């Protein structure tokens, strides 16, 4: 059976030699959860936090073995803060959380302290998570734009970046697309479509 990663490479016309072996291992049959949600109602942090909580509950993901990957840290910082405040659950980040801004001045320090062994839901940019993997990966896709607010610039929306995110999963992938039109048709065709809103 052709893997999601190989299909992605074929559809977007590139080969990433660094991840080729990993792509061979990521057969669709090995995943217990390979789901896609298109959120076309705009980016709302409260709603996204609820959706992530629903995914964790419905799919039975262990938060200690789950990472939320985003294309940039702006959206991740807001969701992580909201998740932590609404659930009172521990989180681990590769960036400085909103309420720790004055304690640490450099995201590099957070990246160096990051480990998958720490207990809590992990939050990371795709770029910072290179070299790591997790049993459960929830990927947040953002709309392309000027890079301000929750939009991303084109350099963060390259197929190689999304491919890297896909290949971080050992077992389960859920993609929440928040208006990224470039990849919508591919994931809609190749993954199980699910709506976690109000569940």
Q: For the regions a protein language model found, what residue spans apply to each?
A:
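Core RecA-like ATPase module of SF1/SF2 helicases and allied nucleic-acid translocases
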Residues: 2-4, 8-11, 18-21, 26, ...
